[in-house]
Amino acid sequence: DIYRRYFELFGIDEYVMRLSKHAPEDLGKKYVNEPELWRRTEGMIRDVLTKAGVPFVEEEDEAAFYGPKIDVQIKSAIGREFSLATIQVDFAQPARFGLTYVDEHNERRTPLCLHRAPLSTHERLIGFLIEHFAGDFPVWLAPEQVRLVPIADRHVPYARQLQERMLAAGLR
């Protein structure tokens, strides 16, 4: 839901949720060689998306080396498709770092790690927004929404009054 709220906020109305899976023939080469973990974690993501009623596509050979992921694919203003947001299931790194927890049966287990980037990286998001809005950003997104420029010294007191009212109204 957080993804949908962000997309609505930024006016992104066309996107595709993608279950990015491994390519079985590349286990041990491009992907961590854990076939059972791949099967389980890809199934977990599929179940979550299905139960949430989220339409999605599945693409093989798009996973991270350490696990499957949900990528949110969007098209830029010039029609280029790219991943804006992602949630990645990492079953490899916790084991490599020796991370464990104690389960309800008092047994040590290796956790799954989730990597989340609901709005991508800062750089990718800013690049997308510049292209998406063609530089014509909505007022709420501008770091400076209003600039008061008194044209004579006698207008300064009134400009200060306006400034106070605008700040009180939440304008920047």
Language model features by range: what are they?
Residues 1-172:
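NTP/phosphate- and nucleic-acid-binding module
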